[in-house]
Amino acid sequence: MEEHYDTMQILCYSLLPCLLFLLSTKFLLYKRKKRNLPPSPLALPIIGHLHLLKLPIHRTLDSLSKKYGPIFSLELGSYLAVVVSSPSLVEECFTKNDIVLANRPDFIGGQRILSYSKTTMGSVEYGELWRNLRRISAIEFFSTSRLTSLFSIRRDEVNILMRRLHSISSNGYAKVELRPMFLDLTSNVILRMVAGKRYYGEDLKDNVEARMFREILEEFFVHITMTNVGDFIPILQWVDFSPHLRKLDGLSKKMDMFFQGLIDEHRNDRERNTMINTFLTLQEQQPEYYTDDIIKGHILVMLIAGTETVATALEWAFANLLNHPEVLNKAKIELDTEVGDNSIEESDFAKLQYLQCIISETLRLHPVAPLLAPHFASADCTIGGYLVPAGTALLVNAWAIQRDPKVWDDPSSFKPERFESEKFGAYSLIPFGEEGELVLEMAWQRG
């Protein structure tokens, strides 16, 4: 009898996890149906759909959208996320629901190192500061007059790159790795515009200040791509299974000290035409709006948005041109016709229509951000007829939209000519972000 009791007890303990799993699954399905949430795969208790997110994530989400439709939801631990993959749904997000979706999710790593207490362009909550930062960016940093005034910086850095390539090939054809050269180019352009500094190049390898900055930025790009499990499962929020969070803290302090040094240096030299000095002038007029933390956060955002991203886009553009010699030849003919033997000026860009098509097609196939930066619903809203509850993270799969055969003819092929004749909706091409951010980014890239 005792043996029979032990057997029953073991059986009960064995069945209990299965029963809990079935009950929790049934509860989740009932709750989802009752609330009219977007369709979703079957979720596991606690982790939800985290086990489905295989790299590269934008391709995984594209596969899920083929099964569940252009809008579906995922439970990322304790977070509910909604993924959209169609131009019409993106338009609905950023027109009808633009204010509700203006904020960003709170992640530990992002808050500690990226946001300077949520005062950067990518983290600030919707409100007066949000409007101020966008207004200042549009007027002071991305306006046509501002970009034109800094043209000499971009020309200088391009000439330095051309001389470097000429030196390498002086004895005939030579194999070169363009990506590090493009990183040097884009980093120096941004740094000179922001702080009047050059930290990259063969002549600066032994410069102590330059080396310190390069090490900080290299470490930053390594750690910022890592995932913290506590962001999705709150009970593990303060358990650091790796030294990731501790390293982020240390990196944050080093970066903060370095940026503060740049600001203090500019306080003693107000003559330079830099973004930091522009901010310091605004700080004198409105110190409550333009604190040192806001300036440092803006420096960081500019470095993130304008270095790796632009270098990657340049690398893809050159790869596409080399793999499609007929496109390269057509671009050469346009340059010879419109510019001739003269050096290209920024005023020539409007005449180089085919070159613009090449840029657009490169960004369509290889968007700078395959998944746009996540947004956060500050209140309940509807997208595509489905409820998106307050607290939901919104993910836009730009990569999927820009390769959608319903939107693009022969979407996997590199065809710049498609931008000469075909007409596309406002949200069919979103390589940087929603419409407002796209305007700023395009001004920056073209500048």
Regions found by a protein language model. Name each.
Residues 34-52, 59-153, 182-191, 207-234, ...:
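Cytochrome P450 substrate-recognition site 1
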Residues 396-423:
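Conserved cytochrome P450 K-helix/beta-meander segment immediately N-terminal to the heme-binding cysteine loop
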Residues 50-69, 257, 265, 325, ...:
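Conserved cytochrome P450 K-helix E-x-x-R motif and the immediately C-terminal K′/meander segment
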Residues 421-447:
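Cytochrome P450 heme-thiolate "Cys pocket" and heme-binding signature region
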Residues 2-33, 188:
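Terminal signal-anchor or tail-anchor transmembrane helices
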Residues 106-114, 148-314, 330:
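Cytochrome P450 heme-thiolate monooxygenase catalytic core
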Residues 309-327, 332-334, 442-447:
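Cytochrome P450 catalytic-core helices
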Residues 157, 262-267, 321-342:
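Juxtamembrane membrane-interface segments of multi-pass membrane proteins
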